[in-house]
């Protein structure tokens, strides 16, 4: 039946893309976007919007795409999202907006993410910018971190007339968008830098190389620099490890370090001062999106890559699209297996991993079946690089240097979900700094909620 199947999106061939860092997905052209937009039923009670953490008016922007009013479609999206070109590429739409699309009950859901990407890319190519506030309201707000939570909070506050400054610890803005997600999924100059410039075009200042807690403390920002409120969106950058023998060997990386050095610092380029050792045979431990990113990056650097994950394929937390792409490119999945030791040679370098096979038992607290070791099933695999992708936690630097800021046992900042308010008056927080490692769009949703909370707080003080 007509309309049941979505317009396919063009991609690089797997064998070709496995050798380069160019973007895998080409996205829709105008004709493809209009055709896909025509599949939208324009539901009066749009369930897709309920699945969007930043509440984009999805039917409205798609209706404009259908009529080829691409600029108006962009302005509708940018009312709610500061990062549409990013979200269109990396959001898990299949479990959010597209997961609730009525079309999906009898066919393919509308490709909402691909349409959002098309609109954002079209706007960038045609020099269209989000609308700026007409005048400032006289209030200063500091935002810590220029990742998705910080950029969203800053952008929303700037639209309301606030004088906003973002403080970024690294030399380049973007947070995890710049250092964590590979070029082949999210181009840095073409997309991330352009989205950052759009936020700056709203009137937001961004100061890089400022480490809050070292360069300056939150209390100093509020007491000496005149900032009336602070939003903490500093992310979760401390990697977790397994605690098994051999983890201190040369050739063991956290996925965070491996991706940062390749994405942000281009350490794979010849002549780089501190080149990264990527090895000929790489083992990536973990099954999330970050594990897929690390594995696919190592593959592009010329390695044979194995992903070791202690559960089965159905339990992989990575997006199905990322798993599909990894398999197409030739990455080997060793499922229901878990490392017990990293083997080290006489010079302190990785020479292999000892692995035990697993089986699934009863469900754990997350609802997934718990992996159980199979006695006597251990074996050894040769490799020269191991990348641990086991999640991250927030750096305690900010919380340990800010009086009255409450954290939980995981060192995450305690903040209310609806406003981002913390235990310290005038200080708000959201994203991975509060939840631990999560998705880009959830961090954006938290930044949006905090912007609303800060506006209500400062408006209340003014009255």
Positions of predicted regions on the chain:
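Glycine-rich dinucleotide-binding loop and its adjacent helix/turn
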Residues: 119-135, 192, 197-211, 239-301, ...
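Ferredoxin-type iron-sulfur electron-transfer modules in oxidoreductases and energy-metabolism complexes
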Residues: 17-35, 57-89, 106-133, 262-263
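Feature captures the FAD/FMN-dependent oxidoreductase FAD-binding
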Residues: 72, 135-136, 140-144, 196-244, ...
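N-terminal Rossmann-like FAD-binding beta1-loop-alpha1 element of flavoenzymes
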Residues: 139-165, 291-299
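Iron-sulfur cluster-binding cysteine motifs and their immediate structural context
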Residues: 42-67, 86-119, 165, 172, ...
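FAD-site-proximal beta/loop scaffold in flavoenzymes
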Residues: 248-279, 363-437
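Rossmann-like dinucleotide-binding cores of NAD(P)H-dependent redox enzymes
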Residues: 163-166, 170-201, 205-207, 295-341
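A conserved FAD-binding loop/helix module that cradles the flavin
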Residues: 433-460
């Amino acid at each position: 039946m007509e309309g049941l199947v979505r317009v396919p999106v063009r991609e690089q061939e797997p064998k070709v893309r496995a050798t380069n860092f160019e973007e895998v997905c080409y996205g829709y052209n105008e004709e493809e976007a209009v055709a896909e937009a025509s599949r939208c039923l324009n539901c009066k009670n749009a369930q897709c919007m309920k699945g969007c953490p930043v509440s984009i008016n999805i039917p409205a922007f798609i209706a404009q795409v259908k009529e080829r009013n691409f600029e108006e479609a962009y302005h509708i999206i940018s009312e709610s999202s500061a990062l549409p070109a990013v979200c269109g590429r990396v959001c898990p739409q299949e479990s959010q907006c597209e997961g609730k699309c009525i079309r999906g009950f009898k066919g393919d859901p509308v490709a909402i993410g691909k349409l959002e990407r098309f609109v954002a890319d079209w706007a960038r190519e045609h020099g269209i910018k989000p609308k700026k506030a007409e005048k400032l309201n006289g209030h200063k707000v500091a935002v810590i971190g220029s990742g998705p939570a910080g950029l969203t909070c800053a952008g929303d506050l700037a639209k309301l007339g606030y004088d906003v400054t973002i403080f970024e610890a690294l030399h380049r803005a973007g947070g995890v968008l710049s250092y964590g997600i590979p070029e082949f999924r999210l181009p840095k100059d073409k997309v991330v830098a352009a989205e950052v410039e759009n936020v700056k075009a709203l009137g937001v200042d961004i100061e890089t190389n400022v480490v809050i807690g070292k360069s300056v403390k939150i209390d100093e920002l509020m007491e000496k620099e005149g900032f009336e409120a602070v939003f903490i969106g500093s992310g979760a950058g401390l990697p977790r490890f397994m605690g098994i023998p051999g983890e201190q060997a040369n050739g063991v990386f956290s996925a965070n370090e491996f991706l940062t050095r390749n994405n942000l610092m281009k350490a794979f380029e010849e002549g780089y001062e501190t080149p990264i050792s990527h090895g000929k045979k790489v083992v990536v431990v973990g099954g999330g999106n970050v594990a897929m990113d690390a594995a696919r990056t190592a593959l592009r650097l010329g390695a044979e890559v194995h992903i070791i994950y202690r559960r089965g394929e159905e339990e992989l937390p990575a997006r199905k699209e990322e798993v599909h792409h990894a398999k197409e490119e030739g990455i080997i999945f060793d499922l229901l297996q878990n490392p017990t030791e990293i083997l080290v040679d006489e010079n302190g370098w990785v020479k292999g991993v000892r692995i035990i096979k697993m089986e699934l038992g009863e469900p754990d607290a997350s609802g997934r079946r718990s992996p159980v070791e199979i006695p006597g099933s251990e074996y050894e695999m040769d490799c020269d690089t191991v990348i641990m992708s086991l999640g991250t936690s927030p750096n305690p630097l900010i919380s340990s240097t800010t009086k009255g800021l409450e954290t939980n046992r995981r060192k995450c900042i305690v903040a209310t979900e609806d406003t981002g308010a913390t235990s310290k008056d005038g200080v708000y927080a959201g994203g991975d700094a509060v939840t631990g490692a999560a998705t880009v769009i959830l961090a954006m949703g938290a930044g949006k909620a905090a912007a609303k909370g800060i506006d209500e707080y400062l408006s209340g003080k003014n009255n």
